[in-house]
């Protein structure tokens, strides 16, 4: 039994919401600490939003600012839409983590610093002049500073174990996790269950981490330094079953749910790339749903395998980030020509080229809409949050299957790795997905035409299977190889209308280009009517957003509306083709602002399509917008 010192009764301060930022070296277990505390708050009933911020280098020199890993969590008893602009509590494991993140802490905020990470060496590596220690030089007097020797306390907790010093020090994050659970009144049963699952085959490591976790909690209970705990009550949420979900998990579960609803096997062809790889990991854990995952040798093989799976009657899907999507481009043109279902997920990151793999961006919109040779229209949709990734992945499948077309779903690194509570939908509430399968026919293929197996004669065009005959939506039938009488040609060379034979006829090419474009345009007929996310139906200014800018825009818009400003917010999920009601909506406002993490790609599409004088707010720093940045831009535009 662990010896538990006598507890005292601290003050309890109620908070509506809290933003906490964990930061340290990439080997300090920061992401695990943040994700476990997030899970505890989600299970408690708080609304949560997270922002894991990874260093760009796989393992930067220890103790340097380049190697700082961060995890920001916003949790509350009210709706939470962003990870927060500024944090209330900053937990840092070394001097570099403080230097990188101090500007994100509110004045008067709490700093919990591992004092062992502020020795001379760490101060030099972090770039503090003359090894000046911020924990002792008075520079942090505007904050509530709590230096804690986490390293020493962790080693003390593991005294008497057979673990080496390095193994003991790897448990430091468990001390921090235990203490933070005490500080915010959360039980540690959740992290203990996690440890039991993680170390079930390593009892010594299980016991060590559990000891340190409890030591951190008990430290808060007995230390005279910490006199206040914080209480954040559960948020009112609709009844149902919830789990914490990241954007990549949402995409994976959405693909599975849609494939099940459509009665199709899901085939996912992928090549590992940051930040999309977790989709492959999640799908590979769900093979009991009939999911087939294939890790290809390169991006081209991955997408071509997915196309082949769709040709064979499965739901083909693939994912990548910008550089990988560039490699898939020729194959996407093939999928357009074949007119078969294919879901392509682009988890956007900082570019161009290799760019900043661990940082977020929205700069692949033009690539998605226009990035293929020839006239090759593909529907493009975008998710707005981790939970919306489920909805939009499901919609991507529905569109791809029912309209026989590839579909591009845009997410980004921010929402892919961020998490929020997700309510499990009822299967009956999911919209039906009906594949347009062709029916088998009593015919055989023969040179020069199609033969009737029963009569041994060449069929007329009326009687023969026409793979490119279309229904009223412009959709061709899905003919599965091996089905009797449905033999037809495929390939990337232009097809003859209806028959699918190879054709170089000029007028036929014009017709096929027009038919493919019309089919994609008609998809907009099935969109739900466009609606505002908040604000008046007409007025002074409309904020038009897309993708992961949703939370920051919504937070800013709601605050501005409360202050009496004539500001509305609409968030676009259909980026090509646009919703048919968008033109009329844009015309009802004097000014339009488009915040996006690129140099104005959606803004220019809106200008080209609707001749609207849209103004841009553009950020390409590898970081998401804050609500304050949106607010400042709106007020500036209103004042013009």
Feature map (PLM): residue ranges:
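Conserved thiamine diphosphate
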Residues: 84, 90, 138-153, 197, ...
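Short glycine-rich or small-residue beta-strand-to-loop segments that form or flank ligand, phosphate
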Residues: 18-25, 176-178, 266-269, 316-319, ...
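Peripheral docking tails and interdomain loops at the edges
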Residues: 26, 150-152, 159-163, 177-182, ...
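Thiamine diphosphate
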Residues: 17-106, 253, 266, 274-370, ...
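Gly-rich Lys/Arg/Thr-decorated short loops/hinges at beta-loop-alpha junctions or inter-strand turns
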Residues: 17, 156-158, 225-240, 258-265, ...
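Flexible, low-complexity linker and terminal segments
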Residues: 237, 245-254, 262, 392, ...
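Active-site cofactor/cluster-binding pocket
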Residues: 2-262
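Short gly/pro/ser/thr-enriched loop/turn and capping motifs at secondary-structure boundaries
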Residues: 55-59, 118-122, 153, 300-302, ...
């Amino acid at each position: 039994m662990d010896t538990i010192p006598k507890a005292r009764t601290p003050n309890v301060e109620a908070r509506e919401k809290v933003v906490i930022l964990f930061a340290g070296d990439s080997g300090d277990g920061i992401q695990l600490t943040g994700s476990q505390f997030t899970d505890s708050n989600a299970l408690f009933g708080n609304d949560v939003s997270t922002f894991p911020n990874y260093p760009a280098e796989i393992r930067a020199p220890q103790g340097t600012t380049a190697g700082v890993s961060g995890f920001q969590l916003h949790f509350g008893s009210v709706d939470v839409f962003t990870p927060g602009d500024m944090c209330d509590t900053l937990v840092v494991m070394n001097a570099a983590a403080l230097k990188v993140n101090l500007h994100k802490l509110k004045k008067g905020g709490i700093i919990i610093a591992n004092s062992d990470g502020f020795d001379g060496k760490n101060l030099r590596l972090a770039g503090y002049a003359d090894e000046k220690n911020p924990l002792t030089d008075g520079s942090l007097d505007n904050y509530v500073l709590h230096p804690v020797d986490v390293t020493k306390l962790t080693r003390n907790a593991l005294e008497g174990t057979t673990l080496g010093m390095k193994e003991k020090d790897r448990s430091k994050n468990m001390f921090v996790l235990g203490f933070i659970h005490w500080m915010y009144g959360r039980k540690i049963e959740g992290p203990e269950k996690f440890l039991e699952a993680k170390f079930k085959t390593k009892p010594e490591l299980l016991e060590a981490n559990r000891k340190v976790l409890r030591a951190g909690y008990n430290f808060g209970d007995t230390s005279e330094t910490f006199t206040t705990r914080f209480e954040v009550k559960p948020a009112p949420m609709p009844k149902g079953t919830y789990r914490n979900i990241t954007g990549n998990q949402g995409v994976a579960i959405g693909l599975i749910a849609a494939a099940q609803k459509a009665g199709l096997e899901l085939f996912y062809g992928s090549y590992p790339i940051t930040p999309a790889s977790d989709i492959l990991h999640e799908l590979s854990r769900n093979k009991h749903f009939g999911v087939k995952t294939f890790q290809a040798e390169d991006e081209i093989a991955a997408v071509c395998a997915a196309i082949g799976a769709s040709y064979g009657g499965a739901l083909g899907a693939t994912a990548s980030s910008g550089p990988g999507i560039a490699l898939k481009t020729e194959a996407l043109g093939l999928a357009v020509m074949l007119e078969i279902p294919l879901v392509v997920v682009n988890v956007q990151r900082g570019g161009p080229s290799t760019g900043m793999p661990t940082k977020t961006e929205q700069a692949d919109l033009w690539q998605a809409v226009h990035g293929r040779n020839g006239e090759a229209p593909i529907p493009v949709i975008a998710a707005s949050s981790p939970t919306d990734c489920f909805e939009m992945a499901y919609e991507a499948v529905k569109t791809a299957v029912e309209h026989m077309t590839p579909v591009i779903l845009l997410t980004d690194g921010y929402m892919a790795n961020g998490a929020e509570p997700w309510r499990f939908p009822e299967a009956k509430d999911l919209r039906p997905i009906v594949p347009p399968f062709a029916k088998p026919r009593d015919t055989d293929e023969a040179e020069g035409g199609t033969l009737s197996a029963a009569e041994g004669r060449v069929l007329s065009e009326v009687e023969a299977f026409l793979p490119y005959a279309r229904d009223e939506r412009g959709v061709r039938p899905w003919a599965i190889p091996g089905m009797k009488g449905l033999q037809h040609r495929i390939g990337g060379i232009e097809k003859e209308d209806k028959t699918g034979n190879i054709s170089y006829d000029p007028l036929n090419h014009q017709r096929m280009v027009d038919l493919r474009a019309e089919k994609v345009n008609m998809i907009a007929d099935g969109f739900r009517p466009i609606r505002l996310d908040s604000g008046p139906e007409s007025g002074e200014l409309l904020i038009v957003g897309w993708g992961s800018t949703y939370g920051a825009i919504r937070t800013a818009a709601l605050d501005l509306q409360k202050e009496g400003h004539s500001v509305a917010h609409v968030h676009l999920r259909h980026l090509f083709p646009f919703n048919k009601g968008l033109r009329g909506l844009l015309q009802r406002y004097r000014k339009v602002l488009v915040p996006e993490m690129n140099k104005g790609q959606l803004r220019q599409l809106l200008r080209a399509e609707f001749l609207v004088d849209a103004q841009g707010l553009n950020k390409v720093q590898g970081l998401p917008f804050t609500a304050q940045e949106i607010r400042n831009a709106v007020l500036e535009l209103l004042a013009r």
